[in-house]
C-alpha cells in the first residue's frame, strides 16, 4: 500500500502546492481522494496510473476539491477506458457531475457510477470488495463539519484468514474440492461424520491497515472516536492554518495544526500526515513549533507535513 500526495494546498494553489488530491495504491488499483484542479497533470510526475483509478472519493463540493474531475474523466477516455468508474461524494454529487459533463463537448463513453453518502448517518460503508485473494477493503464515510456538506473517509484493509494446510492434512483433508469449500467459507463433513468448519483449518488474519481522510473540517471529537474504534493507523487531516490563526480557522470552518494533533491523539493513530496548507505559508516553520512540543510528549508518534509528490509506504 502506498499513498501519493498529488496536491497539498488549500483554496488557492501556489508554486509548490497544487489543489488537494491523494492517491492510494492498493492491490493493483488506485483510489483517489479528492480531485482538485491540475490533478491529472500532477499524476504525470508520479507512478500513479490514471487508468487504474476505479474509485474517486470526494469530501465536499468546493472547487479546490473537484475541478480536476472533468479533465481526468476526459483524459482516461482518450486513453481508451471502457470499464466503469465509481465516484463517491456527499449529497448533490450526482448533480455536480451531471453539470460538469454538460460543459463543452466530450467523448466519455464508459459508465460512471455515482454514489452519494448521507451526512445524517453517523457512519456507513460506501464501498467494499470481496476478492478471492483474501486482500479486500471497506471504505466508510463519516460526516464532518465544514461550510458546506462534507464527509470524511476511512479506508480499511480486510484480510481473510489463511489456510493452514498442515492442519488440514492432519485432519485428513487433501488438496481438492473439500479444501476449496473450506477456503470459500463453507463447512464440510468428513467420511467419519465429523464436521469441519473453516475456523478449524485457518490461521487468523493479521490486522490490515486503516487510513483516515478528514477532508475539510473543524476538529470533531466524534471523528477521532470513530477512527479509534476502527483501529486507524494513519490519519490524513487538514491543517489549513498554524496555531496563531485559530480565529481564522473557526471563521472558515477549517483546522489548525494543533486541532489536527488533538484529533490524532483521540484517534489512536501512530502517524499524522497534515495537508491542505494555506497559500499564506511559504514554509512550515510555524507548524513545526507545535509539532516539536507534541513530539516531546509523544516521541513514538510520526508526524509529517505533506508536500506535493510525497510518497508514504505502509509496510
UniProtKB/Swiss-Prot annotation:
Cofactor, free-text remark: Binds 2 Zn(2+) ions.
Q: Which CDD domains match?
A: RNaseZ_ZiPD-like_MBL-fold
Query: SUPFAM superfamilies attached here?
Result: Metallo-hydrolase/oxidoreductase
Q: Which UniProt keywords apply?
A: Endonuclease, Hydrolase, Metal-binding, Nuclease, tRNA processing, Zinc
Q: Which residues participate in Zn(2+) 2 binding?
A: 64-65, 216, 276
Q: Which residues form a coiled coil?
A: none
Catalytic center at which residues? 64
Q: Which family does it belong to?
A: Belongs to the RNase Z family.
Question: What is the protein name given in its UniProt record?
Answer: Ribonuclease Z
Q: Gene behind this chain?
A: rnz
Amino acid at each position: 500500500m502506498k499513498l501519493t500526495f498529488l496536491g497539498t494546498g488549500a483554496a488557492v494553489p501556489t508554486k509548490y502546492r497544487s489543489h488537494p488530491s491523494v492517491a492510494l495504491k492498493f492491490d493493483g488499483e488506485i483510489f483517489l481522494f479528492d480531485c482538485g484542479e491540475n490533478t491529472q497533470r500532477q499524476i504525470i510526475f508520479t507512478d500513479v496510473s490514471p487508468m487504474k483509478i476505479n474509485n474517486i472519493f470526494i469530501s465536499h463540493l468546493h472547487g479546490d476539491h473537484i475541478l480536476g474531475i472533468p479533465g481526468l474523466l476526459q483524459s482516461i477516455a482518450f486513453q481508451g477506458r471502457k470499464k466503469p468508474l465509481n465516484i463517491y461524494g456527499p449529497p448533490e454529487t450526482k448533480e455536480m457531475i451531471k453539470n460538469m459533463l454538460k460543459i463543452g463537448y466530450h467523448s466519455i463513453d464508459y459508465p460512471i457510477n455515482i454514489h452519494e453518502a448521507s451526512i445524517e448517518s453517523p457512519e456507513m460503508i460506501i464501498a467494499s470488495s470481496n476478492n478471492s485473494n483474501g486482500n479486500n477493503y471497506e471504505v466508510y464515510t463519516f460526516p464532518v463539519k465544514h461550510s458546506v456538506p462534507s464527509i470524511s473517509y476511512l479506508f480499511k484493509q480486510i484480510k481473510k484468514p489463511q489456510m493452514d494446510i498442515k492442519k488440514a492434512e492432519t485432519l485428513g483433508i487433501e488438496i481438492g474440492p473439500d479444501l476449496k469449500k473450506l477456503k470459500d467459507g463453507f463447512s464440510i463433513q468428513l467420511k467419519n461424520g465429523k464436521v469441519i468448519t473453516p475456523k478449524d483449518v485457518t490461521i487468523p488474519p493479521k490486522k490490515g491497515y486503516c487510513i483516515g481522510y478528514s477532508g475539510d473540517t473543524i476538529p470533531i471529537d466524534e471523528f477521532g472516536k470513530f477512527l479509534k474504534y476502527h483501529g486507524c493507523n494513519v490519519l490524513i487531516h487538514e491543517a489549513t492554518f498554524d496555531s496563531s490563526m485559530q480565529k481564522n480557522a473557526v471563521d472558515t470552518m477549517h483546522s489548525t495544526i494543533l486541532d489536527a494533533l488533538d484529533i490524532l491523539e483521540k484517534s489512536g493513530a501512530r502517524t499524522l500526515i497534515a495537508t491542505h496548507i494555506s497559500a499564506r505559508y511559504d514554509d512550515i516553520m510555524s507548524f513545526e513549533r507545535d509539532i516539536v512540543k507534541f513530539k516531546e510528549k509523544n516521541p513514538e508518534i510520526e508526524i509529517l507535513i505533506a508536500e506535493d509528490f510525497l510518497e508514504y509506504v505502509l509496510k
